[in-house]
Amino acid sequence: MAGNIVKWWKHKILGGYKQFSVQECTTDSEELMYHQVRASSSCSAPPDLLLVSERDNNIQLRSPVVNIITTPPGNASGSASNKQQQLQQQQGHQHHHQAMPMPHTHASRHHHHQQQQQQQLPQDMSSSGSHTKHLRISSSSGGKHGKYANMQQQQQQQQTAAAATGVDEDVVDAAAAAAAAPHGAHQQMHSRHLHHHKEERIRLEEFTCDVSVEGGKSSQPLQFSFTFYDLDGHHGKITKDDIVGIVYTIYESIGKSVVVPHCGSKTINVRLTVSPEGKSKSAQQPAMAMGVVPASVPLPAAALGNNNNSNNNNNNKLKKLPTGLAAMSKQMNGGNGGGGALTTSAGTRRQHRYRPRKLIKSDDEDDDSNSEKEKERERERERESHAADQQPSGSGSKGAGSKSHHHHHHHGRYQKNQSGAKLEHQQQQQQQLCCADTPDNTYENMLNLKQDTQAAGNEATVPDCPSSHRQLHHQRQQDIYMKQATQRVKMLRRARKQKYQDHCLETRQRSLSVGNDSGNWQNRHLQQSLQQQPQAAHKSASVSPPPLAGELMLDGVQLRQPRPPHQSHHQQLQQQQQQRKSAECWKSALNRNDLISIIRESMEKNRLCFQLNGKPQANVSPIRQPAAQQQQQQQRQRSSTGSKIPTLIANHSPAAPQSPLSCSPPPCTLSLSLSSSNHPAAATCSIPVPAQAQAQGQAQAQAQVPAPPAVIEVGGGHHQHDHPQPHIPIYHQQLAINPAVLAAQHSHNSAHNKLNLCGYDSFLHATICGGGSAAHSPPPTPSNVATVQPIPKKSHNQKSLLQGYQRLEQQQQQRSSKDYKNYGNLIYAKLSEQLQQKEREQRRHRHKQQQQQHHHQQQQQQQQQQNQQQQQQQQPLKPKEESLAEQRPPTSSSSSAGSKIFGDALECAHLLASEEEDLPASPPLTHSTPSKVVSTDTLIDLNDDVGEAVAEAVTESGGKQQQQQALEADEGQEQEVELDTSASSSMIHRYVHEHIHHHYHHFKEQQDV
């Protein structure tokens, strides 16, 4: 379609009076690229993203191209600057001067030159108000009217429109016309300067397209605001895509409702107001006659007839148009017969456009939502256009507002469409301006304007064409226009398809961001508002972002909104990314649920650890699943795990009966599981280590858990990322750790006994009960902290201690830093400190006892290796019994944690601590549990505060640990080995809980497998 459009432009330019200005381009893109006017934007810049300078040039070419047409041949034949001056003068003065036939001839010549001039002038317009106004007037009235009367009428219309808009455009135009000669060169030079300058800067070009359908929805003045941005800094020439976007938008809004009789014609009055840089260039292109002729493209005569009809329709449409637009078009029409001529041009174009629409109508019927969006945009555009009508720039301001809004809505979707629509607006403006000439002239002028719009740069340098050339151009333009109509249909179809595909792509692309989708989905409204606000801020700044950017893509779900004002695609992407980041998975209920389900899945897989038999529970799906399925299953498991993990905790600890929130504290590991299950909402915090990792991300919003949140952070938005092998089921990950803990347990002679006594699986037993030996590990044992500690800061130091888990800890640290930020770090730290201090005191006592027992056991091991084994068995029994007695009331993991439970107790305490922050209700349980859980392990990896608390608690719990270690004293040496292994196990277990599936999987790879 683009190729056809380019070809059409070529034929129109080459075959038309501007053929010499047309550059023979192999491809549409090349032609657009190489066309002086359109080349810049078409190549590098998206069709929609056209530099305002080029866009202004195009717009000016659209409107001032009419001025060029208006300019007398003598003036038009003048140098581009002279022509521009003359055009301005002629626009202001000459179009009054020019005779009806002259404007056509002049229209072509002046169209060429004035395209150049207007290219320059748009900048000049921006630079000089008089030039701007004059240029505007030239574009609206001087343009295709080419005739003095038509120009006068056009000017009168413009003046009326300006008066209606409160802008003395014609007065300024008269002044500009007077100053046009001096200003012409000045504007030309200035405009050239501005043109280059504006190429550098982004200029806002807004098109207000008031589309009214004769009959039926003609009562619906549809205001389309198309804002084209040349964000590339290239000459923002309106591309076929722009026009297509505009046409398609119009078609989208009215095409569905407009039904053209089988062989009849339907007139759609499209009023295009092109306001470059807030300068009101009002070209009312009424009655884009949507003439449906058996031939796909109506003949120029038919088109001209339709143009005449469009002239009438334009009046009708003017009535139908929004007040400002209608007033403008009425002023345009009332000011001169040129108004009718303008309508005719619009009608002719609209006929052709409508045929494309009719061709596309079935497709357009597919875009009901788009038409609704169009309607919304049209309403907004109406408001904007009415405001613009009130603005000095008149319809230009109207175009600026409405177009900006509409284009923002449609820019992403309708970039192509808008480019095409922009061209069509130019053509429509040209038609409107040329309407005063003759239907043919209007048609030709419309085509010329279009041609000039695209080839304005090329044609700007081209000398004025003879009238014969213009006539040939007129004929060829008609043919080309028919081609263009056909191509426009294709463009519209393509634009519609592109928009549809863009929507689909948006939906798909949005769905591509799986990890952040939840956060985005949860925050999609926030993100949309955020995007819309910056986009609204950038409405006039940049509407270039691809359709994707326009429709907020959250959670990979396309939010079908009328395109919010589109920032540049990158800006929107950045905004979306930022918003997604701001609303990371943890913030999103979807990701939270997914993470919670993942954490619960890992927890249920951890149930292998938590279960007495260490066997996966029914609801645990250890099998790797797709992230979505895994998340869904995890979500299911969250509900089930929320109940089952508390059940496990309840089974394992009297504290298990805690409410899901209170359950999270009980067992370190289980409490994390309970956290995750108990805190499905706070799942971030309530989830076990992955839950904590998730909770970190989520609790960052909750800001409850400092260190375990680091773990929870994994469960949170990052939990998949946090885990070295996030895709590996948490079960496998946990199993990976379980073998590690089991290995530690096995390395600890009492590990199995503790495991059995704990009722935990070998991993959990090794971690928690085996944690007894881990508890034996002196509180300073950094491996415990290093391995499991979610503490982001301490874990860096501790991370060096355990190499195997260092990486995981680094992730934990990263998460934990977030956790510190996001969770109630102080709450968790304090709770975990209190709980862990108590538990650490117990641990320290136990650990001291255990250490003493280790030494004593070392002696005893020498003396009583059998006793050590017995004590190891007893230690699982006794510490487990102690921990069950002490910790099970708070949490089963604590109760089941013998001295090994301490190693995991810290981890559990961390998990609980993070869960505690997530679940302040659980602090008592966590209080009791961490006291034992922390006692279990010297790991001070909860948070920095929690780490300190753990250190204190480990010291405090040293007595208990020593007591338990006294029980384990016989196996003290082995438990010292277990201290390393069990400490590693507890650290591993804690670390696993912190990053449940991630670290479990990691450990699975390392140890389990």
Curated annotation (Swiss-Prot):
Residues 68-83, 121-130, 515-525 have a biased composition (Polar residues). It is found in: Cell membrane; Cytoplasm; Nucleus. Residues 68-166, 328-433, 456-479, 515-580, 619-662, 773-799, 835-899, 955-982 are annotated as: Disordered. Keywords: Cell membrane, Cytoplasm, Developmental protein, Membrane, Metal-binding, Nucleus, Wnt signaling pathway. Residues 217-253 form the EF-hand domain. Residues 349-359, 403-414, 843-857 have a biased composition (Basic residues). InterPro entries: Nkd-like. Signal peptide: none annotated. GO terms for molecular function: zinc ion binding. GO terms for cellular component: cytoplasm; nucleus; plasma membrane. Residues 152-166, 526-535, 570-580, 624-638, 653-662, 858-875 have a biased composition (Low complexity). GO terms for biological process: negative regulation of canonical Wnt signaling pathway; neuroblast fate specification; Wnt signaling pathway. Residues 370-387 have a biased composition (Basic and acidic residues). Interacts with dsh. Belongs to the NKD family. Cell autonomous antagonist of the canonical Wnt signaling pathway. May activate a second Wnt signaling pathway that controls planar cell polarity. Required for neuroblast specification. PANTHER family: PROTEIN NAKED CUTICLE (PTHR22611:SF9). This is Protein naked cuticle. It comes from Drosophila pseudoobscura pseudoobscura.
